[in-house]
């Protein structure tokens, strides 16, 4: 839940060809954070499968409510309605949508009714968190942003 409104701010700037280098770095940080999300989603699902009574769902929902409240308040304090393309309403909608997505991913029901759409979907191509190749770069100036390692070259251990 935390950080993601900040990521979207830089993707919004990138969508206007502003601070492109910063957006590249934010994209890497975003991917790293998502790897943590996936790791913990898998761990939580497995723990729940092995021991269904390990987690009290009420506590999980309270934690999510608090995180959503804090993230909305912080984003509204930092950005509010002062950036074209970001409003207090879109901040609330995005944060609650994201919370619902995270809850679904660990096998729980969504917390917020009516928040089933990402209001910043148009920025997902700038995030390029799945490595779909939506981000274009000058071939001679670009850098590799994928975590994928080549497996076609063998014998490097001998050096």
Model-derived regions, located:
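Extended, helix-rich structural scaffolds rather than catalytic motifs
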Residues: 52-159
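Charged/polar, low-hydrophobicity segments characteristic of intrinsically disordered regions
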Residues: 35-46, 76-78, 107
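Inter-helical turn/loop segments and adjacent helix faces that build the functional surface
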Residues: 9-28, 43-62, 79-86
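Acidic/His metal-coordination segments adjacent to aromatic residues that form catalytic metal sites
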Residues: 1, 14-20, 70, 74
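Alpha-helical bundle segments that constitute or directly flank the non-heme di-iron/ferroxidase center
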Residues: 1-14, 38
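Generic structural signal for well-ordered, non-transmembrane alpha-helical segments
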Residues: 1, 27-38, 65-72
């Amino acid at each position: 839940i935390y950080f993601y409104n900040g990521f979207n701010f830089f993707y919004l700037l990138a969508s206007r060809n502003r601070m492109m280098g910063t957006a590249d770095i934010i994209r890497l940080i975003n991917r790293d954070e998502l790897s943590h999300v996936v790791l913990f989603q898998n761990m939580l699902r497995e723990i729940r499968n092995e021991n269904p009574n390990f987690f009290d769902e009420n506590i999980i929902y309270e934690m999510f409510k608090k995180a959503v409240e804090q993230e909305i308040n912080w984003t509204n304090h930092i950005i509010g309605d002062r950036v074209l393309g970001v409003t207090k309403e879109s901040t609330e909608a995005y944060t609650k949508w994201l919370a619902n997505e995270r809850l679904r991913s660990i096998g729980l029901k969504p917390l917020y009714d009516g928040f089933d759409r990402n209001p910043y979907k148009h920025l997902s191509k700038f995030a390029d968190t799945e490595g779909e190749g939506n981000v274009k770069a000058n071939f001679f100036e670009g850098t590799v942003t994928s975590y994928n390692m080549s497996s076609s070259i063998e014998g490097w251990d001998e050096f």
